[in-house]
C-alpha cells in the first residue's frame, strides 16, 4: 500500500527533540528522511540519559524512528559537495539549529534556492523576529515565555512547567503541518519556500484559552475559577488556577479510594451542565436538582469548592476505575489519573498502535509511542531508529548515484569521518 508521503525526501538536520519530532512524523507517513549527523558523534541525544552503556539512548531511539542516517562533515570541502548534491535530490530541508548556523555552514536560503528552487527549508527557532530572536531556547524556556508556566500551578505556589513537551514536540508538530502545507502549495506554484515555527509561538498557540481569559479578565472576574467562589480578588493577569477546568464546564481532580498510599488514585470529574441532575443522584444530593443555589450553572459557580468537596466524599469511596465505570453509565465526563506504568501496560493502546514494541539491534526490544494520527489508506509502520551513519554508503549510491570509485574518494577525503586532530609538535 502506498504511503501518504511516499516520494517525498527530507534532508534532516535536526537534533534533540523539537525537530526530530517533526521529521519522525513525516517519516511515519512515508517520507524518506535522511538524518545528517556529525561523524563520530551524531545527534547529542544518542548519548544522553543512557540506561544501557554504549547503546543509543531511548531519548534518541524514540524520536528517530523510520529514518536513515548519514554522517557528514559539512566543513570538509568534499562534505560540502555531498551536501550540495543532497539538496538537489531532496524536497525539504529541516533544521533546528541556533540562529544563523545554516548561514555559517555556507548554505543560506539564497544559496539553497539557487541549488534547488523547489526546496522547502523548514526551521524551528526559539523566538520569532524581535528582542529575543537570538536567544537559545529549550523546552521549559519555551513554556515559560509562551504563557504556559505563568498559568500552570496553584495560586499560592510557583509557576510550574507541564510534563507534556509542548515546547519541543508541540512546535515540531506545528512545523510538520507547515511542511505538508508548503508541499501542497508547491504542487500549484512549482516553487519552494521557507517555513518557520517559533517555540514561543507554538506554546502560545496551545495556551490560547488563557489568552482568551486575559481579555475576559478586563471585563470582570473569571467566575469559573475557584478563587471567585473563595472571594479572592483577581489581579490584572490570568492567575494560576490549580486543576480548575479551562473550559466552560467546571472540573477538578478528586481523591479516590487508596489516595493515601497511591499517588495516582485520583479522577478528573467535570460537572457538565446537561448531566447535573444525574450527578446529584449519583452522589446522593437529589435536592440540589431543584435548590436555587445549585440548580443552575451560574448559581453553582460561587459554590464550586463546596460542590467538589461533596463529590469527592463520594469518589473517595470508590477506586478511580470503579468511579469511572459508574459515571460513564450516566454519561458524566470523567477520567482516571493514569500513571505511565498503567499506560505502558494497557493492551488496548498496543492494539491501536498508540504504543508499539520496537526491536533494536543493540538495545533489544523497547516500548515507544506510535503515530498518534491514523490514516485509513496509509497505516504507519514504526521501524527502529538508525545506528550512527548506518546508511551512509547506501545514500551515496542509491540517492546520489555515486559510483564505487566516487564513494571511495569521499571516504578518503575524510568527509565521512570525525575531523582528525593534528599531532602536537
Curated annotation (Swiss-Prot):
Q: Does the keyword Magnesium apply?
A: no
- Pfam families assigned: CoA_transf_3
Q: Which UniProt keywords apply?
A: Transferase
Q: Which SUPFAM superfamilies match?
A: CoA-transferase family III (CaiB/BaiF)
- Residue numbers annotated as active site: 168 (nucleophile)
Q: Does the keyword Transferase apply?
A: yes
Record-level Gene Ontology MF annotations: formyl-CoA transferase activity
Binding of CoA occurs at: 17-18, 38, 72-75, 96-98, 104, 136-139
Q: What is its EC number?
A: 2.8.3.16
The record lists substrate as bound by 247-249
* Pathway field: Metabolic intermediate degradation; oxalate degradation; CO(2) and formate from oxalate: step 1/2
Q: Which reaction does it catalyse?
A: formyl-CoA + oxalate = oxalyl-CoA + formate
Q: What does this protein do?
A: Involved in the catabolism of oxalate and in the adapatation to low pH via the induction of the oxalate-dependent acid tolerance response (ATR). Catalyzes the transfer of the CoA moiety from formyl-CoA to oxalate.
Assembly description? Homodimer.
Q: What family is it from? A: Belongs to the CoA-transferase III family. Frc subfamily.
PANTHER family documented for this protein: SUCCINATE--HYDROXYMETHYLGLUTARATE COA-TRANSFERASE
Which HAMAP family does this one have? Formyl_CoA_transfer
Q: What is this protein called?
A: Formyl-CoA:oxalate CoA-transferase
Organism expressing this protein natively: Bradyrhizobium sp. (strain BTAi1 / ATCC BAA-1182)
Organismal lineage: Bacteria, Pseudomonadati, Pseudomonadota, Alphaproteobacteria, Hyphomicrobiales
